[in-house]
């Protein structure tokens, strides 16, 4: 199916269950300043960097093209990380500004985006990206540190969730999930 057909499939799924796509973003997103689905989507795209998107995959679909592949699915934390694991991810980078105390089936590095969250929920965190905003590290330095952590994690270093014994899964239900 084409990218547009896949997008229409997701939109049809929402409509068939009497839901409006624009009920997303979640209350937590709204508290953080995201007001529309477009705002949330722009944030997702920015996290992909500057590489061109080579394919849009169905939920839990496995990549067969080299490059940046986008995976269709809901923004729900546990459902999306379960889908990434089913798609074959070996390490997941999960950025959060509010903190989410869960563990996915694959090692999931929690990347905290602000110092306040790190101060209050340090045992949930794997990487503090808030050091960029505080000026403690440059973007390049933090990127290098995160890259090293990804390599260590892929080589067997446990994530914070794994050390706490958290290994939840959540399969996308037949219906709308925010």
Where are the predicted features?
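Active-site rim loops that border cofactor/substrate pockets in soluble metabolic enzymes
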Residues: 23-79
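Hydrophobic alpha-helical bundle architecture
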Residues: 56-119, 131-135
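Gly/His-enriched, cation/cofactor- and phosphate-binding structural elements
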Residues: 124
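Conserved structured core elements
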Residues: 4, 74-78, 144
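Single conserved hydrophobic/aromatic residue that forms the stacking wall/gate
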Residues: 1-10
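Extended hydrophobic packing segments that form well-structured cores
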Residues: 88-90, 95, 106, 129, ...
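Flexible, glycine/charged-enriched surface loops at secondary-structure junctions
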Residues: 14-31, 157-169
């Amino acid at each position: 199916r084409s990218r547009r057909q896949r997008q229409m499939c997701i939109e049809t799924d929402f409509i068939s269950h009497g839901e409006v796509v624009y009920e997303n973003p979640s209350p937590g997103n709204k508290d953080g300043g995201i007001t529309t689905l477009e705002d949330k989507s722009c944030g997702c795209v920015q996290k992909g960097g500057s590489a061109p998107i080579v394919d849009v995959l169905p939920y839990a679909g496995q990549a067969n093209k080299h490059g940046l592949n986008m995976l269709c699915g809901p923004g729900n934390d546990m459902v999306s990380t379960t889908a990434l694991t089913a798609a074959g991810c070996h390490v997941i980078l999960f950025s959060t500004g509010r903190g989410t105390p869960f563990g996915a089936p694959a090692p999931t590095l929690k990347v905290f985006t602000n110092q306040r969250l790190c101060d209050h929920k340090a045992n949930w965190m794997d990487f503090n990206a808030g050091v960029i905003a505080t000026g403690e590290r440059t973007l390049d330095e933090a990127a290098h540190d995160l890259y090293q952590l990804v390599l260590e994690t892929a080589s067997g270093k446990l994530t914070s969730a794994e050390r706490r014994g958290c290994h939840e899964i959540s399969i996308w239900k037949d219906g709308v999930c925010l």
